[in-house]
UniProtKB/Swiss-Prot annotation:
Hydrolyzes the pyrophosphate bond of UDP-2,3-diacylglucosamine to yield 2,3-diacylglucosamine 1-phosphate (lipid X) and UMP by catalyzing the attack of water at the alpha-P atom. Involved in the biosynthesis of lipid A, a phosphorylated glycolipid that anchors the lipopolysaccharide to the outer membrane of the cell. This is UDP-2,3-diacylglucosamine hydrolase. Mn(2+) 2 binds at residues 41, 78, 113, 194. It comes from Shewanella sp. (strain W3-18-1). It comes from the Bacteria.
Amino acid sequence: MRTLFIGDLHLSADRLDITQAFTHFLDTELDDADALYILGDLFEVWVGDDIAAPFALELANKLKQVSLKLPVYFIHGNRDFMLGKQFARAAGMQILPEVTCLNLYGVKTVILHGDSLCTLDKAYQRFRKLRSLALARWLYGCLSKKTRQGIADNIRSKSKSSNKHKSYTIMDVEPNAVNALLARTHAQYMIHGHTHRPAIHQLDNGCKRIVVGDWYQQGSVLSVSPQGIDLQSLPFSPQQD
């Protein structure tokens, strides 16, 4: 009896080794799981359900099989915020609000991707506010596939260049934002990703903030059970089929 949390896999056609590792995880690690939560950035980029790459469609079929055995939940990240109902249905995933509260074996828990907590990054927060507008998302969806892909590639390039010049503090969550969300939700645990800095933080207010890691060099999964929390690393195996 346990609930699993992952995020920041950044799956792409350029890194099929990560997709292979994730498929291996789905095949081998879920037998005793009550649910699987994917906390955003499942894909490196997602410009619309109508442009899903072949590897993504294969993954949808795999997740659909998993969803027949246990519920699979998804929260949008900053890379896959355009992932829609069409793909979610194909994958058997239920899309959750960007901030969701759970009762995890008697412990009130708030889960989210985590980018909303990086409030010191003013430029990114302005972009995040714009992209959250329904009108902006609708207009983007009306563009041609080629134009959407070009815009996404341009944003990724600028983001990568900009992040090289940002400090560690700006790129991390802001403590006041963390405390405010915990106070608003009355949660004891906060679980998020985004920062790629896996850790279990014991806060001064008695709460815990748990950060799931990325899947660039190895897998990262958080297991929560009635016995407690366990943040695990999953080495990529060359023997994965």
